């Protein structure tokens, strides 16, 4: 295997940082946006090709958005643990740890995917009942969720594989692979729904097939590479020590991401109580606003990976520079994305559903959510910075308090008095503001950059 960094990989340990952060972050953002397009194309196509039942079909897909996010985010966070372990080992030039972490990650992804599929199929019905999916939407929502859950092994495998590539600085390969899968997803959606006249079952099948293709392509690339991340099928096993390191960092990060989604499930339950039109509006808006969030979050991932490698190499001052530059560049990039969406928001909403009431309510949601993005950007980057040092539990705990705690309290205590869509959405800026303050206080007092460098996280 080659010890030197490939030309397509970023050298995070030497040279200027400011110009390398966008080179890492933008492909990550583009990849995340394509992943969102899997679900967005589902919503858009069922909203335009299912005739009189389009509102029910859109609401059925939307009712699952936060449930799916809860599951996927948990294991994407654990995959981030693999990212940090591998990045730290690369910084230390520890090839053996890189090899063990790569093989452990792949096995964990597949086994966890099968576990979620089995448990998810058992709990799908009661979970949809728990979040108060309306009776007229329930059967379609359940059908979509059951099919989607069958694809969890390949969905998780792709996300762990992408984390492996990103830990080396290669963010372009996951983007290229997902571009191919994304185009396939849209074509399959059109074929199943417009040609075969299927409904949510067609778009769910298309999403699973597309994710299978992306995971297989990335696995093939890992098998063929001669770099440290080379995969040897006969070596696929879980290394206990590496697994513990991944879980130590990744599980709190996964809980942090899952808590975000869990809080949104609570909010979705309140939204469901306002009827099908509000559900459809919220679903359409979510599939648009999340594109700006993907830009925002990409710099947080860059912060984690850059800090992880530099921490492994003992370059602590460089770690601090990474945080400052991530906040500055993230602010500029996210602001551009937000402005574009605000300008074209109503036109974008009409792609999903051209009902005037749905468009109006959807745009209201976009405005309310974007009002909180300054707080979101700050807490995401500060959390990413701490994770790069292997500090993952504290951000997870504070996020649970700030996001999940505040939003649940809001829905329980405030929403019953102000039973409106705006009354629900106000929970977003309030909870994100509280979380940003908590993370800042923790960062100021904990001072992770003052930690003494250790051999392993």
Give the positions of each predicted feature.
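Helix-terminus/linker motif at the lipid-water interface of multi-pass membrane proteins
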Residues: 33, 37-59, 128-135, 191-198, ...
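Short runs within selected transmembrane alpha-helices of multi-pass transporters and secretion channels
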Residues: 79, 148-166, 174-182, 203-218, ...
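Small-residue hotspots at the loop-to-helix junctions and early N-terminal turns
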Residues: 55-66, 141, 145, 204, ...
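Membrane-helix interface/capping residues of multi-pass secondary transporters
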Residues: 43, 55-58, 95, 124, ...
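Small-residue-rich hydrophobic transmembrane alpha-helices
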Residues: 58-118, 155-174, 268, 281-345, ...
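Residue-level signal for short hydrophobic patches within transmembrane helices
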Residues: 14, 18-37, 41, 67-74, ...
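Transmembrane helical elements of multi-pass membrane transporters/channels
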Residues: 23-42, 147, 181, 210-214, ...
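Short alpha-helical transmembrane segments in multi-pass integral membrane proteins
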Residues: 1-25, 86-151, 184, 195-251, ...
């Amino acid at each position: 295997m080659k010890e030197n960094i490939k030309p397509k990989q970023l050298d995070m340990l030497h040279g200027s940082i400011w110009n390398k952060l966008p080179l890492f972050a933008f492909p990550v953002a583009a990849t995340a946006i394509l992943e969102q397009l899997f679900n967005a194309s589902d919503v858009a196509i069922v909203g335009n090709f299912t005739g009189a039942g389009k509102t029910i079909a859109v609401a059925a897909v939307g009712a699952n958005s936060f449930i799916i996010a809860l599951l996927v985010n948990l294991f994407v966070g654990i995959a981030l643990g693999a990212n940090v372990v591998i990045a730290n080992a690369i910084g230390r030039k520890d090839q053996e740890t890189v090899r063990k972490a790569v093989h452990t990650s792949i096995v964990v992804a597949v086994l966890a995917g099968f576990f979620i599929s089995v448990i998810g199929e058992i709990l799908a019905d009661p979970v949809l009942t728990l979040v108060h999916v309306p009776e007229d939407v329930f059967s379609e929502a359940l059908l979509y969720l059951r099919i989607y859950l069958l694809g969890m092994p390949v969905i998780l495998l792709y996300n762990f594989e992408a984390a492996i590539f990103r830990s080396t600085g290669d963010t372009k390969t996951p983007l290229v692979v997902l571009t191919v899968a994304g185009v396939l997803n849209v074509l399959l959606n059109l074929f199943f729904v417009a040609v075969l006249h299927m409904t949510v079952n067609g778009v769910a099948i298309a999403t699973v097939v597309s994710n299978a293709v992306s995971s297989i392509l990335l696995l093939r690339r890992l098998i063929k590479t001669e770099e440290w991340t080379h995969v040897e099928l006969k070596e696929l096993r879980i290394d206990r020590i590496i697994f513990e390191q991944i879980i130590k960092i990744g599980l709190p990060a996964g809980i942090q991401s899952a808590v975000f989604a869990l809080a949104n499930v609570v909010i979705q339950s309140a939204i469901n109580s306002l009827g099908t039109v509000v559900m459809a509006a919220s679903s359409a808006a979510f599939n648009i606003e999340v594109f700006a969030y993907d830009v925002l979050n990409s710099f947080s991932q860059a912060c984690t990976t850059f800090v992880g490698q530099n921490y492994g190499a003992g370059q602590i001052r460089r770690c601090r520079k990474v945080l400052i530059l991530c906040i500055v560049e993230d602010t500029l990039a996210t602001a551009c994305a937000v402005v574009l969406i605000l300008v074209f928001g109503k036109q974008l909403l009409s792609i999903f559903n051209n009902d005037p009431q749905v468009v109006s309510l959807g745009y209201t949601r976009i405005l309310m959510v974007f009002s909180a993005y300054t707080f979101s950007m700050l807490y995401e980057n500060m959390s990413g910075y701490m994770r790069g040092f292997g500090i993952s539990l504290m951000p997870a705990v504070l996020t649970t308090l700030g996001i999940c705690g505040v939003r649940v309290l809001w829905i329980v205590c405030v929403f019953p008095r102000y039973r409106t869509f705006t009354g629900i959405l106000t929970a977003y800026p309030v909870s994100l503001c509280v979380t940003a303050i908590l993370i800042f206080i923790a960062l100021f007092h904990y001072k992770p950059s003052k930690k003494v460098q250790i051999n392993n996280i």
